Amino acid sequence: EVRLQENDLIVSKTDMKGRITYVNRTFMRISNYAEHEVMGKQHNVVRHPDVPRGVYRLMWDTLKAGNEFFGVLKNLTADGHFYWVLANVTLDRNATGEVAGYFSVRRSVSPDAVREASDLYAEMLRIERQAGSAAAPEASLAWLKSAMAERMVSFEQFTLASCRD
């Protein structure tokens, strides 16, 4: 596992199709990718298979609704290691205010936040395996929404509460 320092901020930008248009040095250092290896590639190049597809469905639904997304995510490095982050993804607007892409800032998370996310994601992954590939994202997202409703919080509230020290 690659551990982020408290002051590490991983920054990346993508176009509307999710292709990387910018990464900062911290992104390159933590992910072990050189800039030329990721520019123009889909941002899911760092997606770890332990994060359910339903979480990414929620992220895209949230962004398409014009809102920012917060989530604890496990990412994959170029050499097969992983790192956990608190991700904040927002719309990236051009000078005229039109959405031109997406802007993501990721930072370190506590072991407690990782534990909570891991437990949630394990159940979502179990549901995705049972649902089959095509139905997997919707099935696990439905379960996630139900689990959050039982706790009377949104996924964002759950995420941010789990990240408080």
PLM region spans:
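Sensory/regulatory domains in signal-transduction proteins
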Residues: 1-126
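Sensory coupling linkers of modular signal transduction proteins
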Residues: 96-156, 163-164
